[in-house]
Amino acid sequence: MDAVTINSFFMIGALLIGISVLLSPVSSKLGIPILLVFLAVGMLAGEDGIGQIAFDNYPVAYLVSNLALAIILLDGGMRTRVASFRVAFWPSVSLATLGVAVTTLLTGLLAMWLFNLSLLQGVLVGAIVGSTDAAAVFSLLKGRSLNERVGATLEIESGTNDPMAVFLTVTLIAVLGSAETNLSAGFLLLSFAQQFGVGALLGLAGGWILWWLINRNQLPEGLYSILAVSGGLMIFALSNALGGSGILSIYLTGLLLGNRPTRSRHAILNVLDGMTWLAQIGMFLVLGLLVTPSELMEIALPGLALAVGMILFARPIAVWIGLAPFKSFTAREKWFVSWVGLRGAVPIILAVFPMMAGLPNAQLYFNLAFFVVMVSLVVQGGTLTKAMSLAKVELPPKPEPISRTGVEIYPTSEWELFIYKLKADKWCIGEPLRNLFMPEGTRIAAVFRDNQLLHPSGSTELCEGDTLCVMAQERDLESLSRLFSEAPEKASLARFFGDFFLDIEAKLQDVALLYGLDLGELEADAKLKDLVLEHLGETPVLGDYFEWHGLQWVVADVVDWKVTKIGLRLPPEEELQEGAE
C-alpha cells in the first residue's frame, strides 16, 4: 500500500464520517433511528451506490465491528446504574437466555419454510438474528424517560443476551461444518457455561483490576480514558480467546467502573461519549459498504416476511414466555418490551461467522441478517416514540443539566458541577434563593444573568434565562430535577403523576373521608402503603399505578426503592359531570 492509497483512504474515510455527522439531524426530523442514517451513507458509498466503492473484506468488517461494539458496551456499562438490577436483573437474564432460545427456534422454523432450508440451517438463521443489539438499544433509548422496570430490562437484556446468540451460532456452525461434531447434552452445557461463566468472571475480575489500576496510579487526566479503553479491550479479547463472551465481559467491566468511585470517571465518560459516536458511525458505515443492495432485492419479499414474522410472532412469544414468572410486568409493558427487540450490528457480525467458515448459503445468511436489521431499525426504531405513548411506559421527562463536570478535589471525588438554564415555565422563576430548599449538602456556586456573574444572596430572585451552577453529587440529581422541573410539553404527561399527592404513611380512613370513599372493615385500619403493597408488590417503580374505588393511584415518588408519595389521578371533568347527572 503506497502513500497515495493511504492518503485516499484517509480522505474517503473522513468524508464519509463527516457526511454521516452532518446528516445526523435528519434522523430526528424524519423520525428514523440515527443508526439507519449511518447505514444508508455506507450503502450509498458502496458498489451499488453513487460512491462505487467495492468492499467485500469480511475479516476487516468483523474487526471493525467488534472493536466498535466493545467501545459501545464499555460506555453503556459505565452509564448503567447497578441499582436498576433490583427490578430488572432476573427478567433480563430470562430474556437473554430463554427469550433468545425461543426467538431463535421460532424464527428458524419460519426461515426454514420461507427459504427451503434444512432445520439446522433455518435455526442458524434464527440464532444469527435472535439477540437484541446493545448499540441500537442504547442509542435509541438514550435520553428517553421510560418506566425504570422496562427501560432497565431492555438495556440489561441487550448487554447480556449476546453470549446466548454467539453460543447457538458457533455451535450450529460447528455442526453444519463437520458431520463429526458431537452434539451431546454435555457438549452444549459446557459451551453454554463457558460463554457465560468465563465472560462474567473475566468481566468482573478484570474490571476490578482495571478499577484498582486507575485509582492506584496518578496520571495526566487524558490518560485515564486511554487506560480504561485499553484495559476494557484487553478483557474483551482475553475473554474471547478463552472461549467466553467478550461482549458480556466488557459490559460488566464498564458496569463495575461506572458504579464504583473511580478516579476521573467523568473525564473517562466524556471521552467515551465521543468514541462511542465514532464507533457507531464507523461500524455502520463499514456494514453498509459490505452489503450489495441489488442482492437484497432478490430476497426482499421472503426477507420482509421473515422480519415481520420475527417482530410480530417470534419476539412477542419469547417475551411473554420469558417474563411469565415476573408478575410485576403488566401486559402493556410486555408488549412494549416485545416491540423494542431492536436488531443492529450484532446480527450482521454473527452473519460474518458462516462467511468466514465457508458454509453453504453463507451469503444468504448475511443478506437475511442485514435485511432483518434494516426492517427492525425502520419499523421498530421509527415507531419507538409512538409505542412508548401507546404502552403508557413514558414518564414525564426529567430536566437534565445542560452541562455537568466532575470536580476532582480528591482521587475518588463524587462531587460535580451541574449547570442549569432556567426557562419561563420553571416554577422557581421569581422565587428568592432562600426558598429553593436545596438538597442537603448541595450549594449554588454561581448565578449568571445576561452573561454577567452575580453576587447572589438569599433574597436574590431568579429570572428567566438565569444560569445556575450547582455543586452536588449524582445522588442529588433526582431532587435537583424536581427542584428545577418544568411543565411537560405533552398534555397527556402534564398530570401523569396525579392531581393530588398523598404521603405513603397516610391512613386509608383519612383518605376515604377526604375523597368520599366507602371502605370495608379490613381497609379502615390500613395505611396507603399497605394498599400499594397489595396492588403493586414489593418493588414498584415510578409511574406504576392501579385502580381502586374508581380512581387511579400513581407512584409519584420513590426514594431508595421505597415509595414515599402516591398521586391521585381524578377522572376527567366530563366523566365527573356525567357521574353527577
UniProtKB/Swiss-Prot annotation:
Topology of this chain in the membrane: Multi-pass membrane protein
Key words of the record: Antiport, Cell inner membrane, Cell membrane, Ion transport, Membrane, Potassium, Potassium transport, Transmembrane, Transmembrane helix, Transport
Primary localization: membrane
Gene Ontology CC terms: plasma membrane
UniProt key word Transcription regulation: no
Catalysed transformations (reactions): K(+)(in) + H(+)(out) = K(+)(out) + H(+)(in)
Keyword Ion transport: yes
Gene Ontology biological-process entries: cell volume homeostasis
Domain RCK C-terminal intervals: 405-486
Pfam families registered for this protein in UniProt: CorC_HlyC, Na_H_Exchanger, TrkA_C
Noted pH dependence of activity: Optimum pH is 7.75. Inactive below pH 6.5.
Membrane spanning stretches: 3-23, 30-50, 58-78, 87-107, 109-129, 195-215, 232-252, 271-291, 304-324, 335-355, 364-384
InterPro entries: Cation/H_exchanger_TM, FAD-bd_PCMH-like_sf, Na+/solute_symporter_sf, NhaP2, RCK_C, RCK_C_sf, Transptr-assoc_dom
GO molecular function, one term: potassium:proton antiporter activity
Subcellular location: Cell inner membrane
Family listed: Belongs to the monovalent cation:proton antiporter 1 (CPA1) transporter (TC 2.A.36) family. NhaP2 subfamily.
Role: K(+)/H(+) antiporter that extrudes potassium in exchange for external protons and maintains the internal concentration of potassium under toxic levels. In vitro, can also catalyze Rb(+)/H(+), Na(+)/H(+) and, possibly, Li(+)/K(+) exchange, but not Li(+)/H(+) exchange. Nonelectrogenic antiporter that exchanges one cation per proton.
HAMAP family: NhaP2
Database matches in PANTHER family: K(+)_H(+) ANTIPORTER NHAP2, NA(+)/H(+) ANTIPORTER 1
Protein name (Swiss-Prot/TrEMBL): K(+)/H(+) antiporter NhaP2
Natural source organism: Vibrio cholerae serotype O1 (strain ATCC 39541 / Classical Ogawa 395 / O395)
Protein encoded by which gene: nhaP2
